[in-house]
Design a protein with these regions (language model features):
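PRPP-associated nucleotide enzymes
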Residues: 1-260
């Protein structure tokens, strides 16, 4: 198995070169673990001059020759399900996983409501909190939405009542600037000033160390993230305001499934 880390742009060429070299050796089994698919937010073109970089990055897997069939590529919390269709099906097969089970292991009844900051997060994550045996959701939900006022973008609560809860945790797949998370927290506390708000993202792809300081200044009770972006996770691993959820067990499980 090859662990592909793409949280630094300078590494992309080297990572694909190494993966291609390994595949060319025709091992008995071979798979690629790519926890972070970095161009996920550029998954579509809204204007004629937009460049869909997610599809461009995925096309690099054309360089990976099949190894006794298509090469499995494991991706954690992909931004949009349609992105798996960008990968060349004759070369690789995408296997999707999520960090939600790890996060739920951190939950207690005192965590309060699960907050979904936009429609995308609601579509991605709400189903993960549904218990089929009990035929109900495990937590109450608060849903937020983005709306524009001229050139400004605001976040407001569209479903649920923050006044009913002492605590809440915002869940999203990634953050670069923490802007949406902070605005969502502000929207909750505008309705209930006493609510304590935590946040979880699968991918903490911070664009700079200033984002870390911005998160701390915003006053989140706790900020959960995985180490799918290892360089950025290293920035906060010793900071008590953050808790890093290691993807080690998910990676091992993916490798074992690939050996079956």
């Amino acid at each position: 198995a090859f662990l592909m880390s793409l949280d630094e742009e300078v590494d992309v060429s080297r990572q694909f070169s190494a993966a291609r070299w390994m595949a060319m050796k025709k091992p008995h089994t071979f798979q690629i673990l790519m926890p972070w698919f970095p161009n996920g937010t550029m998954d579509r073109s809204d204007r004629e001059d937009d460049v869909c970089t997610a599809e461009t990055l995925a096309s690099n897997f054309l360089l990976i020759p099949p190894v006794r069939g298509t090469v499995p590529v494991w991706v954690l919390d992909i931004h949009s399900l349609q992105e798996q269709n960008y990968f060349p099906a004759n070369n690789v097969s995408v296997r999707l996983s999520t960090s939600m089970n790890m996060l739920q292991g951190e939950f207690t009844p005192e965590m309060g409501a699960v907050v979904l900051p936009d429609d995308g997060a609601e579509k991605r994550y709400k189903a993960h909190f549904y218990n089929r045996e009990a035929d109900r959701y495990l937590y109450d939900f608060i849903v937020c939405g983005k709306h524009r006022d001229g050139d400004k973008r605001h976040v407001r609560v569209t479903e649920g009542d923050p006044r009913k809860f002492e605590r809440a945790v915002i869940i999203d797949d990634l953050t670069r600037t923490a802007g949406t998370l902070i605005k969502c927290k502000e929207a909750l506390q505008a309705i209930n000033p006493n609510i304590k708000v935590s946040a979880h993202v699968a991918h903490g792809d911070f664009e700079s160390r200033e984002v870390v300081e911005r998160i701390k200044a915003a006053g989140f009770e706790r900020f959960y993230m995985t180490n799918s972006c290892p360089v950025k996770a290293g920035w906060v691993k010793d900071d008590p305001a953050f808790k890093i959820l290691s993807i080690d067990k998910l990676a091992v499980a993916a490798i074992r499934r690939g050996l079956d």
